[in-house]
Amino acid sequence: PSDSSKIWRKFSYGALMDVFMIDMYTKKDIDLITPSAYHILGQEQDFWLKNELSNSPARWKIVGNQKMIAGWSVVGLPAWFPGDGTYLTTSSWDGWDEARDALLLYLKNNNIHNVVFMSGDSHVTLVADLSDDPYDVGNYSGSSGAGSIACEFLPTSMTRGNFDEMG
């Protein structure tokens, strides 16, 4: 973007890849579960990202993502956890599940392939297939990856401990 107050941007590496750096902090609305009127990226950045992904001729489309986009649902959490015990945290895309679902559905409906989210700030190492409904075995297969819309990589923590190192 031409406005220097907007930190989201794209870096192109020829036909190999486009890297899209997004900003999840300056435009997001308050943390709510399923907030119909809210968006984690803000409308302008959401439009920009979808437009850039649609028009990218690169083989790989890498999205630099500050927080985990895969759902992190944990069975048996106390009801005082976000979403009445459904989510471990709402500071990730879990707090804006409608925005996440809309982005994944956009990728799927527009046949945008080879999208990789590189995420951070979760203090775990994780690789995930991203599906519009990972619990629907007719739509997604965890063993083969069939039905995956994109994938996500979270590297280990760089300067702080992971969950297994806290105590």
PLM features per residue range, with description:
Residues 1-167:
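Metal-dependent phosphoester/phosphodiester hydrolase catalytic core
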